[in-house]
Amino acid sequence: MGETAGERALSRVHSVRERIGHSLSAHTNELVAVFSRLVNQGKGMLQPHQITAEYNAAIPEAEREKLKNTPFEDLLRGAQEAIVIPPWVALAIRPRPGVWEYVRVNVSELGVEELSVLRYLQFKEQLANGSTDNNFVLELDFGPFNASFPRPSLSKSIGNGVQFLNRHLSSKLFHDKESMYPLLNFLRAHNYKGMTMMLNDRIRSLGTLQGALRKAETHLSGLPADTPYTEFHHRFQELGLEKGWGDCAQRASETIHLLLDLLEAPDPSSLEKFLGTIPMVLNVVILSPHGYFAQANVLGYPDTGGQVVYILDQVRAMENEMLLRIKQQGLDITPKILIVTRMLPDAHGTTCGQRLEKVLGTEHTHILRVPFKTEDGIVRKWISRFEVWPYLEAYTDDVAHEIAGELQANPDLIIGNYSDGNLVACLLAHKLGVTHCTIAHALEKTKYPNSDLYWKKFEDHYHFSCQFTADLIAMNHADFIITSTFQEIAGNKDTVGQYESHMAFTMPGLYRVVHGIDVFDPKFNIVSPGADMSIYFPYTEQQKRLTSLHTEIEELLFSDVENAEHKFVLKDKKKPIIFSMARLDRVKNMTGLVEMYGRNPRLQELVNLVVVCGDHGKVSKDKEEQVEFKKMFDLIEKYNLSGHIRWISAQMNRVRNGELYRYICDMKGAFVQPAFYEAFGLTVIEAMTCGLPTFATAYGGPAEIIVNGVSGYHIDPYQNDKASALLVGFFGKCQEDPSHWNKISQGGLQRIEEKYTWKLYSERLMTLSGVYGFWKYVSNLDRRETRRYLEMLYALKYRKMAATVPLAVEGETSGE
């Protein structure tokens, strides 16, 4: 359908070209001053903070005050990057999350030209190529496949996909009696290992179904509410109803009443509630191949951190929710959850060489380890997450065989984690026809600036050509995508979201993505995790406190000994502690925290700094970690921090870590998470759950977790002096008024209770699985056309790139 005249007029009024034209006529001097400074930088790319710096340098403060909230300022504030190829400056402008416009200004002639995504990317490629590449370039465009598919248009709808989907498809599918047949067929198809559930062959039409439901409702109304299913199952079978309606008369009556309401007057919330009550998810497979995946003694190993903790906490909550639902549905079925990871025969004292390992705190959840293989046999040693690509296709086939043996059935849901796990999950779900969920944890493209444009520079070490392609394939294949925060999908008003950065990008010489993903797609859902409440609980709960660990903790923090577990000795042991715990890599920015602390003598007077990262006991296999390790020592020496800092090796005992957070609460300290980008921020959740006031990066998930100034504070890792001044202000105020510390601590605890618990997470995940599974069955939501396109991208592009990644050589150290 074409645009109306009104829509065209509206579009013209709001076009970026016209907005710049108006700014040019109203603020010619200012615009020329700013753009001339940009051009004077020479050929290159400027990030938002650099554009702001040039704006501040070009326009005096008094003039900037007059320009506040004008279209001119909005234009520059909305610019996410500037591509400078004199005399041209091209801007990528983001008026709001998920909405982009592109424009090019000729600074010499003051000409303005609006650009399509394609033309903007072509212009940008000149930075890498030196000139426009006239050869045919592969363009990836997923837009046409979704053109007829519904999508919301408001930024506030991003991440609430299931609500939008239910509203749209309910009205589309249930507009008359005939259109209800897909629901009937869906219920009739329900079975588990040959056992019929919900409906049997007696129900052949909607009329028969409604009649049976009314008779069942009448029968149940004469029974006590707690009558078990076994006492009315014969009557149900006569009516055509099988197991799955409920474990007692009251619950079965509620389910039947819900379905009758749906058949009479369908509405989205009733549909979601009904789908949440019927048995749909009984077997789950979770993919997380890379790193050292185990329950103990692995945290801090290369590529092993928050994702492992997330999944172990996730499966405990999921199993509890599955067991509860299965019981309430009146089924005698044992659910199974398999966490599939890579087997590491060179396990280094961990259980990573063990094929099957039961997850503690569960009854029916296991870690299933499947090795990587080559023609020479099993690959024994750890391989960096950046080098796993050549193994994954064969690995998927092996995994399919192993899970078939373990489950004796197809899984009902496959969840991928991170790029490698998501690709394997995608291939597996495609093969088995199973509902596929993606959890990114972190998309590397946002962590390494310009890693798409200059991918060739990164290729030897990071192999981003494979990774970014795998990410595109997985996110477009997924039935639904879970993120922990809105930030992951679409950032905020100032920063671009992880998924949003995949909407349009270019990898010169490889391919150009003109439409990679749509952040308004209803497959996106925000489901925030929590911390394990048995380990992480408030410091005020004295009866639960693990005081027996305090001697060990004091040794860790304060002993005068330097060894493989801790370096440097604190001089004044009574001062509050700034505490931080993360992997030692560039993005986590632990060295940035040390530098921030080192540059502020007043902060050193007020508090000690304790960092937990790396391993003093062994040389890292990871190149990036080696660089950061050396940098840390250099900074401690440069700022003469001995006596003010304690550097502790990575701690793998989560129980003790929980008490360590609480011990630092006792000392009225604070937790700082200084990452350049953090997808979610599990340590932020852990610290806040223990009651520790938290300062965390403004880039990524923590900015959403923390309400600034209420439940913690946002810091900018690119502005060390401002961040350290904020910490000085906090601890200074706490010295004058100790209740201020309590206020922020309580604010953090309240925030966690409202939004970040595993119980809320597991309830939502199970409901989403049911809803998307249903819509996949009854509609074209499986997006067959898209999947054919993805097959071509995988077969013709990804496989060739993966073949160029060198295989690990046994006996050598991977990543060296």
Swiss-Prot record:
Keywords: Glycosyltransferase, Transferase
InterPro entries for the chain: Glyco_trans_1, Sucrose_synth_GT-B1, Sucrose_synthase_pln/cyn, SUS_EPBD, SUS_N
Protein's name according to its UniProt entry: Sucrose synthase 2
PANTHER family linked to this entry: PTHR45839, SUCROSE SYNTHASE 3
Keyword Transferase in record: yes
Function noted in UniProt: Sucrose-cleaving enzyme that provides UDP-glucose and fructose for various metabolic pathways.
GO MF entries: sucrose synthase activity
The UniProt record lists the keyword Glycosyltransferase: yes
Quaternary structure note: Forms homotetramers and heterotetramers with SS1, all three possible heterotetramers are formed.
Region (GT-B glycosyltransferase): 280-757
Pfam families for this protein: Glycos_transf_1 (PF00534), GT-B_Sucrose_synth (PF00862), SUS_EPBD (PF24862), SUS_N (PF24861)
UniProt catalytic activity: an NDP-alpha-D-glucose + D-fructose = a ribonucleoside 5'-diphosphate + sucrose + H(+)
Swiss-Prot/TrEMBL GO biological process terms: sucrose metabolic process
Tissues showing expression: Abundant in developing endosperm, low in aleurone, and undetected in coleoptiles and roots. Also detected in crude extracts of anthers and in immature embryos.
E.C. designation(s): 2.4.1.13
Gene that this polypeptide is encoded by: SS2
